[in-house]
């Protein structure tokens, strides 16, 4: 892995500093109460799962993902989209809870891949094993149709050797602290995606590995704000940055800048979104009545809320609730949908 051509430009240095500053602030803040953090993590997890599977062509909305997650115990998923979401959700939970116990080795990568595709019927033959057929990367339109080859990946023959070299580079570079941990993660991911070691699921696995690398490097706020949704919102730029760097990886001096800048800006967006959410939570809780806090708790847990829901939950009068809802809408903490009897409220 040729990293000598990485240029630490003033903008890149500024991004690294801003992200690290937030990492330090998060650790010292004590941030929010555990139940508030759990609510944030739940929302971020739903966004991450929805976005990461949609980037690959799934059509499930965040709302459908949320409904599916509430039925995970059933272990019966009819569509391919549902199978992919279920696998992604389980691996995300594993990473969040056990990131200190998952060394990034060939065995663990294959285990994560096997778990990721656990419910995917069409992937039964190859899950948990490196590819045996070529799998050049295509770009997909919103209908899920392939609209062209983005780049050619490693051959099945070269894949085991290339992965062994990449994993050795990762282990050595982390142990010797030769590079900033965010740059290590970026270099690993772009190489992993250029090799594309598994027959399918590489994109999803790369985003799970990004989270794992960040958590292991001490960026413990990552589960509370979705990086995947930032990437989904700039999908064209994501593919372009990947392609611009990946096509140079075998050159004497690879061009790392497009990918490094894309990923660092995405990480900047991720932490800024979280800072806004935390500030909004703090402000909300310091200024709100007990009833308003209960309404916000309910909508975070259920995705939506009606006056009838809160009459049932709190016993408050409809008139008091209507006034409280109006206040929350005014403060831009909730948004009103529908009208009349079918009015409901959701988070912005």
Regions found by a protein language model. Name each.
Residues 1-348:
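FIC/Doc superfamily catalytic core
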